[in-house]
Amino acid sequence: MAVTMADITKLRKMTGAGMMDCKNALTEAEGDYDKAMEIIRKKGQAVAAKRSERDASEGCVLAKTTGDYAVVIALKCETDFVAQNADFVKLTQDILDLAVANKCKTLDEVKALPMGNGTVQDAVVDRSGITGEKMELDGYMTVEGTSTAVYNHMNRNGLCTIVAFNKNVDDQLAKQVAMQIAAMNPIAIDEDGVSEEVKEKEIAVAIEKTKAEQVQKAVEAALKKANINPAHVDSEEHMESNMAKGWITAEDIAKAKEIIATVSAEKAAHLPEQMIQNIAKGRLGKFLKEVCLLNQEDIMDAKKTVREVLAAADPELKVLDFKRFTLKAE
């Protein structure tokens, strides 16, 4: 039988496979959709196996709560077209539902769950075979508490958060906290949740940055005193181009280089240690305010912190845990 464009389009919507793959499969299957899907699946599995090293950076991220338990999971693929396919999204939702129902602790447990005639992992391989794209499960995380909330950013299935509380929470407030986590990407609930390794790294970076700034200030002051514009001599490239423009002379450049070398060494050798430490600690404090959920400015009211918003709702209300997963690099 003749294969029409309508037939090809229908199969493409059903499978997410390419137009030519759909046409060839329908031709081979003589118009039988079930047979065509099986042909695409087998061909796709072979193609997908060859794509195992490819980057699956698109996909579908979903989250679900049962009240005291919440889960987030991602099914990843190669293209946005496949990620938005209804069957692909449904498969992600079905896997999520199974994971929640079984309260799986790990991704391996999820993959081993019975699904259809095989396991969840088998179902993912089958879908990979249909589309010919690499697919993999990722981002499986859970939280538990007296109450939990989830947030799917703009309902686009690309970024989801889950959060657990020690008490029952107003739905709007719970969603607001989940949105806060999505928008501001905290790494911990409060300072106690930030590892000493991270704090030590940040303070070390802050110290070096502060020292460099103090040296730079001294150099710029010395250059200005010598009637040399610091912006004209801040790099070898600028020195050459500015001399070509007639803004500075070769003598200015020689003098500037001498000042930069001498003042830099002198200032670096006599930096006030206590001042450096104080500035660095201030920068660490700013860092902790930015990365700790409770310290962050509330996205709905920048005059308050998340801690203050929660305390206003209930002084005993606490965030127990949260998780965040996104497909996009940040």
Swiss-Prot record:
Any Pfam family hit: EF_TS
Domain of life: Bacteria
Annotated stretches, region: Involved in Mg(2+) ion dislocation from EF-Tu: 79-82
Location(s) in or outside the cell: Cytoplasm
GO terms for biological process, alphabetical: translational elongation
Keywords per UniProt: Cytoplasm, Elongation factor, Protein biosynthesis
Gene3D superfamilies for the chain: 1.10.286.20, DNA helicase RuvA subunit, C-terminal domain, Elongation factor Ts, dimerisation domain
GO cellular component: cytoplasm
Gene Ontology terms for molecular function: translation elongation factor activity
Broad class of where this protein is predominantly found: cytoplasm
Similarity comment text for this entry: Belongs to the EF-Ts family.
Record function comment: Associates with the EF-Tu.GDP complex and induces the exchange of GDP to GTP. It remains bound to the aminoacyl-tRNA.EF-Tu.GTP complex up to the GTP hydrolysis stage on the ribosome.
Protein name: Elongation factor Ts
